Curated annotation (Swiss-Prot):
Assembly description: Forms oligomeric structures.
Name used for this protein in its record: 17.8 kDa class I heat shock protein
Matching PROSITE patterns: SHSP
Keywords attached to this entry: Cytoplasm, Stress response
InterPro entries per record: A-crystallin/Hsp20_dom, HSP20-like_chaperone, Small_HSP
Family statement: Belongs to the small heat shock protein (HSP20) family.
Compartments in which it is found: Cytoplasm
Organism this protein belongs to: Solanum lycopersicum
GO terms for MF: unfolded protein binding
Length: 154
């Protein structure tokens, strides 16, 4: 863990300069402190997401170990915003139970991303397998310029 926030050097980290990220800038996120923009103090509240762009779709991958697909929501909004949210509830305590350690995260999470203009918002698909949520956002095909041959006279 670095003591210096990775604002400029890590292309994979959420950056305040990323035009597609709608997350609130949190200077303490990279230092390992609890998030300042969330009431939760768990790592689950700061769910990390990988977003890659391939020639055809944008692909989002989210590690959500222990969650069922019924506990996760994937939504799209009018302004090309993709929202991924969910909640893991705290295990109910029985007064006869003696807890020795409680380290698993619980709480709510929500991440929002503004998608590029070429995203086909009406064709977004999501699947969940082995605790990994995959959201696929197809892209509009780039129209290739039409090339017309000109006959040379003379």
């Amino acid at each position: 863990m670095s003591l210096i926030p990775r604002i400029f050097g890590d292309r994979r980290s959420s950056s305040m300069f990323d035009p597609f990220s709608i997350d609130v800038f949190d200077p303490f996120r990279e230092l390992g402190f609890p998030s300042t923009n969330s009431g939760e103090s768990s790592a689950f509240a700061n769910t990390r997401i990988d977003w890659k762009e391939t020639p055809e779709p944008h692909v989002f991958k989210v590690d959500l170990p222990g969650l069922k697909k019924e506990e996760v929501k994937v939504e799209v909004e009018e302004d090309r915003v993709l929202q991924i949210s969910g909640e893991r509830n705290v295990e109910k305590e029985d007064k006869n139970d003696k807890w020795h350690r409680m380290e698993r995260s619980s709480g709510k999470f929500m991440r929002r991303f503004r998608l590029p203009e070429n995203a086909k918002m009406d064709q977004v698909k999501a699947s969940m397998e082995n605790g990994v949520l995959t959201v696929t956002v197809p892209k509009e095909e780039v129209k290739k310029p039409e090339v017309k041959s000109i006959e040379i006279s003379g």
